[in-house]
Every structure is written in structure tokens, then in C-alpha cells.
Amino acid sequence: MEKPVLISDEVNYAWNFLNYPIHTITAKPKEESSKSCAILLIHGFGASTDHWRFNIPVLSDKYEVHAIDLLGFGKSPKPTDVQYSSHLWKDQVATYVKEVIKKPTFIVGNSLGGYASLAASAELKELSAGVVLLNAAGMFSEEKVSNNSLLQKSLKTFFETFLRGNVFLQRTIFESMRRRVNIKKALNNVYKNQANVDDYLIDSIRKPSLDPGAFNVFKSVFNPTGVQGEPFDKLFKKLTSPLLLLWGGKDPWMNTASKRLLYKKYAPENTKEVILDAGHCPHDEVPELVNQHILDWIDSL
């Protein structure tokens, strides 16, 4: 098992986005490196920079490594006057690369962070050295016009409309989901090996959910024009840098057979795919494998 980084409880507000202070972490090799690129780590929905505890120490042995808390998550602010969306987080990632890193960057993202990483990389062009998707969240155009029956579509539309307009029900779900016992249960469901589902991980998710404004971020998942962004197939057409797909093959959420087929159909030619014996968060469940695959892939380019 990789040795975890001792992530401080203190915040590092060294950079602002939309006039909000953003918590960031930067780690560099102890000895001066000749590497001309950097690595940026982007967490998923409800997570934070803490989720890279096993990755930052290893990757930063060779490369300059950055990790940021997306606006609305972790130690970053959770303003109530912001429209939370994939577009917002894509802009945050791209802006950080342009304003802070200022050199070609390998952007690594898990779940929602995977989508933000891909979308930002497609926009960054020459500042994108490559993209690593760890069970990324997002949709393809074909999925948005799927062949569901009329009844299925009607039930889905009714449920989404009812839930979207019912703040009381949303709040009830939110309060239930942020209980420690339920956070642990959810993590156990998406980690094939639960050895790393520890108090540190649970607290890293629960503490930010207690911040004022956290409920407004959670509500964004019910906004039909919110979290979902541009389809993957369109983003792949814009991407000019190499792509590494690191799949946790036992992910109950993202790694469906139909989804994998769509990746194979639309992913650019310069794509490598690796299937790992893990769940939705392979970087935290099997970090030694993820770290090695990332480093080997970068070295091979």
C-alpha cells in the first residue's frame, strides 16, 4: 500500500476563481526536476483534495503535482449565488492551468472530476499534455436519445420533475446522505476492497457537507441544465492530447458494458485503456496500481 500524504487541516487560499478563494495543494520533487510538464488532480462530486492522499506523495517524486478543491467542495467556499454546473468546474480547471501552472499539464480526474478534466483539456489545447480519466461521469450523445420505452421515459421525467421541485424532499435526502453511517455504506458499495474506507476518508466527505451552502451544491444534481455538460463524443473530437482510461472494472455506477462500448467507439486514436480490479475510485482503492500506470503512461509519451 502506498504511504498516504499527511494532508493538513489548514487551508491554502493562494488562488482565486470568480473572486472566491480556492483551496489548493502543490507538491514538487525534493530534487529539481527537468520535467517540462505538471500533473493536476481533480476530485469527484462530494470529495476533495483529501481523496488524493495516496497519489500526491508518489506522483510528486517525479513531477510537480497540483490538486484543487472545486468550488462548492472540500475546503473551498460553497457560495449560494453560484450556478453549479459542469461548465463552471470545467472553467475552474482550465483557468487554474492557465493562471497558476502555466505549462503543459496532465489532468487526472475521477467521476465528476473526470468530466471537468476532459472538458478543460479539450479547451486548453497545447496546455493539455494528456488526460487520465478514472471512471469519469458524463454521457454520450447516443445515451441522451436512448431507446427507452415511452413508459420508462414518462416515469423518469415525472420522478425528476417531482424531485427537482421538492426542496423538502431534496433536503431530507441530503441530510440522510451526509450521516457518517450512510457515507460509509455508500463508499463500501463502490469500493470492491473496503480496506481504505477508513475514518479519514469518511470525515473528508462529511466535514465539507456540514459547511453553509453545501446543500445548494447538492441540489445542483437535480438541475437538468446544471451538472450535465457537453457529450463525451463531442469533447473527444476537440481533444488534441493523449488519453488514458483507467477503469475500476467493478464500478456499479459508471462502468457498464454499453458505456465501455461507447468509449471504444468515440475515444480518439491516441487512447490507452486499462481495466483494474477496483470500484468507482481506483486511485484510492488501488493507488499503487493507478500511480504506476499513470507514471508509465506519461513516460511512454
Where do the PLM segments sit?
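Short N-terminal helix/helix-N-cap motif within the alpha/beta-hydrolase-1
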Residues: 47-57, 75-78, 116, 141-142, ...
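Active-site loop/oxyanion-hole signature of alpha/beta-hydrolase fold enzymes
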Residues: 11, 15-20, 27-31, 66-108, ...
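Catalytic active-site module of serine/aspartate enzymes centered on a nucleophile-bearing elbow/loop
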Residues: 269-301
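Conserved HGGG/HGGXW glycine-rich cap/lid loop of the alpha/beta-hydrolase fold
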Residues: 26-75
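Flexible "cap/lid" loop of the alpha/beta hydrolase fold
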Residues: 122, 131-171
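Short glycine-enriched nucleophile-adjacent loop
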Residues: 114-125, 131
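Conserved loop-alpha-helix segment in the C-terminal half of the alpha/beta-hydrolase fold
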Residues: 238-278
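Conserved alpha/beta-hydrolase catalytic His-Asp/Glu region
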Residues: 170-237
